[in-house]
Each structure stands twice: as C-alpha cells, then as structure tokens.
Amino acid sequence: MAKGKFERTKPHVNVGTIGHVDHGKTTLTAAITTVLTKKFGGEAKDYSQIDNAPEEKARGITINTSHVEYETETRHYAHVDCPGHADYVKNMITGAAQMDGAILVVSAADGPMPQTREHILLARQVGVPYIIVFLNKADMVDDAELLELVEMEVRELLSKYDFPGDDTPIIKGSAKLALEGDQSDIGEPAIFRLAEALDTYIPTPERAVDGTFLMPVEDVFSISGRGTVVTGRVERGIVKVGDEIEIVGLKPTIKTTCTGVEMFRKLLDQGQAGDNVGVLLRGTKREEVERGQVLAKVGSIKPHTKFTAEIYVLGKDEGGRHTPFFNGYRPQFYFRTTDVTGAVELPAGTEMVMPGDNVSISVSLIAPIAMEEGLRFAIREGGRTVGAGVVAKIIE
C-alpha cells in the first residue's frame, strides 16, 4: 500500500554525509531513510544497498556515490553517501554532488579523526555552506563528560575552519539503534531531531532560475541582416529581449544588448536556466565573441587570472598521469567550455604532487576567465583529463 503519492511541491535540498572512515556515515544514511520513510513515506534503503555504490563519471573522473532520497514534513532531500575517502575527495572537488549542506558524522567513542578534519577543510574549500553534526555511537559512551568533551572538540575544529562552531547543531545518537527501531533518546528520536535540524538550519537554496543571468558561450554565428547569434545553455537566471548584458572573459569586457532569444528555431521573449538557446546580440561583431566567454548580467561577474584552488589529481589507474608534477607545472584548465593554459604554484614545503593526491594550489592563467569562488574546472594535458578542481579564492 503506497503511503500517499510523491509530492513534487516540497522544496528540494541536496545534502550528504561526510566524516572519518567507520564513524557510521552509511549506517546513518540507512537509518535516516528507514526512520523517515515510516513517517513520511518513500523508500527505505538498507546498509548493503547504500554501501554498494554505483560508479558515475564527473568531469572525466570516475566516482562511486550512493544516492538516496527522503522526505520530511516540509522538504524533499537528495542525499549522497560515498564508500571511500577518495570518493569523498573527488565528489566534493568535482561538484558531482553539489551539497547545500553536509551531515558530519563523528563517532562519540573516537572523537574527531584525520578525515574528520580533512572533510571539514574540503567543505570549506569547495564552498559547502552549512554543516550539521551527528555525534554517532552514543550508545558506546557511558560517560556524559566524555560526550561533552568530544562535542567541544568538534565545535573547535569547525570554528578553526571558519564554520560557526558554537552555533552548529550537534545531534547525539546511535544510527545502529535507530536502524533497529530503538525508541530511547539516542535511537529513532535522534533521527527526527536530525531531520528537524536539516529543515531549520539549512536554508532553502536559491533556484537556478532566480540567480543572476549567466550563459557560457558554446558557439557563435553571424546571420546576415540580423547580427551575431551566441548559443549555449543558460546556467542561471533569465535573459529577456531588450536586456543589457556583458560578454566577459578572455578579452576586455564589452556591453551589448539582447535583441532576440530563440530555442528550437522559435523566437521567445526570454530564455531561462536550463534552456539551450541562441541569443541575438545587437551591434556585436562575430569576432568579438568566442567560445569560453560568458554572457552575464551587467556587473555580476568579473574576469580573473589568479586564484587558489583545491584540486584532485587522477591516479595512474584512473587514466591520469603516471608521474608526479612539480612547481611551475603548466597544464590546461578547462573552464565551462574552453581550455586556458595556467602555471601552477605548489604550497610552501610541497616538493611535488603525486597522481592520486589532493592539494591546494595557486594558479596564474595566461588569459582571464569569468570567475567566481566555487567554480569547477578540469585539468587537462592535450585534451586528456588529468585532474579536477574548484576555485577556492580569487586573488586577482
């Protein structure tokens, strides 16, 4: 018997579990689907279904990720869980599963461990905006003072990486007990407290269509008597006929006006996020626009050449490099629709980067790209993907 039909009317939020190996991320994921399904409908997933994560590709990189979904009173959640540490690193850096918030799972019996720290740092670097903590395995800790000590440690660690440690919701519980239907405070009720924290602490994300207009340029044509048409997929926002827009990146920024929008050979009065459109530009010459630039709302995005980034370097077995690279390495950086060569500066004290590593680097591009913090890119050598990255901070 179906428990009511699936309502698409609830706002949709993307979350995921992060944290140290064996602290209970997958068990918690199973517990959330099992407990919430009983109350709000949907499909429960057991541990083995989640742990057996299928492979997917993002920016030329293979990642194992499990996707589950569940509902609360007010929202619909898509939740990602990864089997291995390397999958987390790849997932967060490629943005394969963009997270509006993360559930950091910390074993109350062990406290914060090296990957706890690394995942918090990664979340900061790749722009995961909110973290909620689930202090798991609370059934294994009899000493209330010890629990409090672990909680303090986690809060300090969050604050260290610029998350609001003092205000972060921390839910104490046991995913294992919750999964078994236990009704004590740390069993099922802990999962409902976690759901409430998700609903209240993570704001509803802005829909792509409500953002400021941005469209990566894929192709440029000139149509005699009508002018220049730029094609691409609108990444966010809306473009209307008559809007003043800017062409940003690679060359000096120029202003132009949208005089027409067409889709499937039909004229429209606007194009919006997700649409593949042709945008007609007034008074713009065919050679003034090229693939790799973006059309954007005036003043909303600037071109930059220098930035710091968090990158993942493909291992040899993933089709990546077979040898390390050193300071001054010059690959191509593939942003949106084009490659730009850039020079890599390694952090002080880092001699070289091995295939399979993740590392923070500084990059200087030979041409400016329309850039914002959180922008994803691939690292390529002659068209072959050797890594992936995300802009952490713009320098100039």
UniProtKB/Swiss-Prot annotation:
Q: Which CDD domains match?
A: EF_Tu, EFTU_II, EFTU_III
Q: Which InterPro entries match?
A: EF-Tu_GTP-bd, EF-Tu_GTPase, EFTu-like_2, EFTU_2, G_TR_CS, P-loop_NTPase, Small_GTP-bd, T_Tr_GTP-bd_dom
Superkingdom of this entry's organism? Bacteria
Q: Where does Mg(2+) bind?
A: T26
Keyword Magnesium attached: yes
Region feature (G1) = 19-26
**Reaction catalysed?**
GTP + H2O = GDP + phosphate + H(+)
Annotated region G5: the residues are: 174-176
Cellular component aspect of the GO annotation: cytosol
Purpose? GTP hydrolase that promotes the GTP-dependent binding of aminoacyl-tRNA to the A-site of ribosomes during protein biosynthesis.
Q: Which family does it belong to?
A: Belongs to the TRAFAC class translation factor GTPase superfamily. Classic translation factor GTPase family. EF-Tu/EF-1A subfamily.
The cross-references to PANTHER family, in alphabetical order and at most eight, read:
ELONGATION FACTOR TU, MITOCHONDRIAL, ELONGATION FACTOR TU-RELATED
Q: What is this protein called in UniProt? A: Elongation factor Tu 1
Q: Which organism is it from?
A: Methylobacillus flagellatus (strain ATCC 51484 / DSM 6875 / VKM B-1610 / KT)
